[in-house]
From Swiss-Prot:
The conversion to 3-oxoalanine (also known as C-formylglycine, FGly), of a serine or cysteine residue in prokaryotes and of a cysteine residue in eukaryotes, is critical for catalytic activity. Its EC number is 3.1.6.6. The gene is betC. This is Choline-sulfatase. Gene3D superfamilies: Alkaline Phosphatase, subunit A (3.40.720.10). Belongs to the sulfatase family. The lineage of its organism: Bacteria, Pseudomonadati, Pseudomonadota, Alphaproteobacteria, Hyphomicrobiales.
Amino acid sequence: MTTGKPNILIIMVDQLNGKLFPDGPADFLHAPNLKALAKRSARFHNNYTSSPLCAPARASFMAGQLPSRTRVYDNAAEYQSSIPTYAHHLRRAGYYTALSGKMHFVGPDQLHGFEERLTTDIYPADFGWTPDYRKPGERIDWWYHNLGSVTGAGVAEITNQMEYDDEVAFLANQKLYQLSRENDDESRRPWCLTVSFTHPHDPYVARRKFWDLYEDCEHLTPEVGAIPLDEQDPHSQRIMLSCDYQNFDVTEENVRRSRRAYFANISYLDEKVGELIDTLTRTRMLDDTLILFCSDHGDMLGERGLWFKMNFFEGSARVPLMIAGPGIAPGLHLTPTSNLDVTPTLADLAGISLEEVRPWTDGVSLVPMVNGVERTEPVLMEYAAEASYAPLVAIREGKWKYVYCALDPEQLFDLEADPLELTNLAENPRGPVDQATLTAFRDMRAAHWDMEAFDAAVRESQARRWVVYEALRNGAYYPWDHQPLQKASERYMRNHMNLDTLEESKRYPRGE
């Protein structure tokens, strides 16, 4: 039975560099399932995160709002229950909504519109990872990134992250089977299942069978070598110091092994994606299901000597986005887009009036773009977390990228002429066009942001959370970490059930 609305499968991964997906996965990646998905997808070449860090990126992804609006500035900022997310919009429209995997919600609300959450999260839900602008330069050792992920890169058959993602995939597939059993029910609802993996996020450790795929890989060396600390821009210097770079001797072999493990973990994820699509196919739901593949932010992978994220360079800020399914014409789109566009796009595809969604989002629907009408709005990004001493903002429009922080010199890059972002045109304009472009971006920035107010809001949020966190660590502790609930008496075979009805209802397809 069809409801007239598409089912939706969102596959989200963590820290996947968008430069590796120029038109689907790069040729050298062993990713047959993602390559097959790309062939039938609308592919967005220049898609960007709203903020290059997990929790703010994901909160913005779900709401379609910038961090300055969600107030999820960092990995320990509470996500308020009153903020509408795509799960809320779809649920209002009659969808069943569920999450398997990571979303890094901070605070007592661990659902944010999802009716069901199949797993716990992999990261803490409390305020413990709060940075502190009052102490610039302080390195909080027990949770800040360090380069141990790079020097320790290699092979393992099980890790904390593998254990998590194996569970995420298993429970997601089980949920798809359960949903397929309802296909013939007159009262069934369309569904939106979000499956959110933590790979290929560091640590850079991969299973042997995927590691071996990249034995002869020619892409294990960064395009831009390590830039000395004193030649880096100020924010990159702060990132290096926050990652404790001076206490790690990162060798060329460490870099190669880290990148190899990262590529291997893309192949690991590809296998998981293949399992999900295979389940959709065998349960006859594929043709009625929209599939959206995305990442929260990227990873620098040693380019410029930088690792992880936390900046607006392409490796950190640019992320894959592919959408496949009924009504979606396959093709490559080059106009810059944003993860903020996902919520209005999902609403549009689900037949929800955008007038109901527009007040609650900073993004735009990509459906017109898929149908040939280009997106014209600039792409906005923000960062106000560890390694920053004041908020940073960025604007991507046309071939240009502009970066601003009140503490630092401005940056302007021409990404057509300088895709590796080696020439800052704000410092060395080539002529009047560059100067006029810089002036236009300054005006745009002033129109979009009150940087003093932004900074004050971040500082107030951090200070409040430090007070609350220290208090809650004294005495009895009530965790906010999500605990999935299962009713054992309603599973499998129990004496209060009609066993004949049970066996028939659990079978799908039936009568074959």
